[in-house]
């Protein structure tokens, strides 16, 4: 809600979706994908922080207070590389920390948007979270603030031309 209230960009129509049943088939993402038919999708999610004892920090490289994570792939999703580059540039431009992660055994809602209606440009950003899927988790306020700033700046500067460019690919003969 905070993000939706702060982005004022007449060039885009912004939808905020809170989805359900990600863990059992991305069902909420399926419903919103079919109803909204978005041009570009930015999934905001959480991911395991591997900076606590007992967690494999190779498998889970994200650390609290090192910035949000950009998911490079999961078992159902592969991000649009132009969106990845645009978000990396936005982070650099705003001097914001950004980590990178992958997930071989889980999935974000991005996987559903990858395949709906011929596929949509999608990218997933995650807040590193300790004790994910427990009765309480822990995030860093600095990571939250960096994520909010990154997305706000990205959406505020988004144009129809940029949105169209995310879907344009050069055909190789």
PLM region spans:
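A generic local structural motif
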Residues: 4, 27-30, 111
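Alpha-helical metal-binding/catalytic segments enriched in His/Glu/Asp
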Residues: 1-23, 147-154
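Acidic, glycine-rich active-site loops and adjacent beta-strand->loop/helix elements
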Residues: 17-24, 46-48, 129-131
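Metal-dependent peptidase/peptidase-like ectodomains
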Residues: 27-97
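Short coil/turn connectors at secondary-structure junctions
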Residues: 9-14, 37-39, 94, 119-122
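Alpha-helix C-terminal capping segments
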Residues: 2-8, 34-36, 114-119
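Active-site-adjacent substrate-binding region
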Residues: 65-148, 154-173
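Short, mixed-charge aromatic SLiMs
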Residues: 21-28, 173
């Amino acid at each position: 809600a905070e993000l939706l209230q702060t982005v004022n960009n007449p060039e885009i129509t912004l939808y905020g979706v809170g989805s359900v049943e990600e863990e059992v088939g991305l069902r909420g993402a399926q419903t919103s994908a079919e109803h909204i038919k978005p041009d570009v999708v930015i999934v905001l999610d959480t991911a395991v922080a591997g900076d606590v004892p007992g967690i494999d920090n190779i498998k889970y490289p994200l650390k609290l207070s090192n910035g949000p994570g950009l998911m490079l792939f999961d078992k159902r999703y592969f991000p649009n590389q132009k969106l990845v580059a645009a978000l990396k540039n936005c982070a650099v431009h705003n001097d914001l920390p950004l980590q990178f992660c992958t997930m071989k055994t889980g999935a974000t809602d991005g996987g559903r948007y990858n395949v709906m209606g011929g596929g949509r440009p999608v990218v997933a950003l995650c807040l590193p979270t300790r004790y994910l899927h427990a009765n309480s988790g822990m995030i860093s306020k600095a990571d939250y603030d960096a994520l909010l700033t990154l997305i706000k700046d990205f959406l505020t500067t988004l144009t129809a031309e940029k949105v169209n460019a995310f879907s344009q690919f050069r055909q190789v003969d």
